[in-house]
């Protein structure tokens, strides 16, 4: 999901979170729009004088970087919506709800892998998930309810369910990185000039 398109209305971040929640997508990738060199978007923005970095500085990384052009609405509004939405998507309870909903709807796999003993790495990962999500955090009640729900209703996907729950340990760390790096970039921006749209509004 991308935020920062021309003509985008306020609340785009909230609409993305609402859509992901209603559809039950477990891991939703999200970023701010970046113009890449030698693309039609880059050429148009260059003609319009809206690029704010040259080709050498264009990174293409859209999760921890601000837009590299002047958008049609305040960049601070877009950035704050993005950070709020990213954090909401990977809030532990919300993420767990989506993962459970997703795996309950999935049918059992048509093939069955050969049974094997879990490795030490697997056991360590499982212990981390159980400790953090099933004991330490506010997700503890959900965790055990959903775990037993999966074991009862879709046991063939129980291992995958736990594996995807474990992914949120990475996303939770990445949330902090996104917040910090975007906030630092916002602090370094000069004050924004009023947009033409605001200037034309009646007094």
Annotate each language-model stretch with its function.
Residues 104-105, 112-203:
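Terminal low-complexity segments of carbohydrate-biosynthetic enzymes
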Residues 1-126, 130-137:
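A structural motif corresponding to the C-terminal lobe/cap of the Radical SAM core domain
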């Amino acid at each position: 999901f991308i935020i920062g398109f021309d003509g985008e209305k306020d609340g785009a971040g909230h609409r993305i979170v609402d859509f992901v929640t209603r559809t039950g997508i477990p891991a939703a990738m999200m970023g701010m729009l970046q113009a890449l060199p030698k693309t039609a978007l880059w050429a148009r923005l260059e003609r319009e004088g809206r690029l704010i970095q040259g080709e050498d500085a264009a990174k293409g990384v859209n999760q921890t970087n601000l837009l590299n052009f002047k958008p049609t609405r305040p960049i601070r509004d877009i950035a704050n919506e993005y950070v709020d939405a990213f954090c909401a998507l990977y809030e532990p309870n919300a993420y767990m709800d989506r993962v459970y909903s997703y795996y309950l709807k999935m049918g059992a796999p048509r093939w069955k892998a050969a049974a094997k003993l879990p490795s030490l790495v697997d056991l360590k990962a499982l212990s981390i998930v159980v400790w953090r999500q099933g004991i330490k955090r506010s997700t503890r009640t959900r965790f055990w309810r959903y775990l037993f729900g999966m074991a009862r209703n879709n046991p063939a996907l129980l291992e995958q369910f736990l594996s995807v729950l474990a992914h949120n340990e990475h996303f939770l760390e990445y949330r902090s990185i996104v917040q910090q790096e975007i906030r630092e970039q916002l602090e370094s921006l000069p004050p924004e000039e009023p947009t033409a749209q605001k200037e034309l509004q009646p007094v």
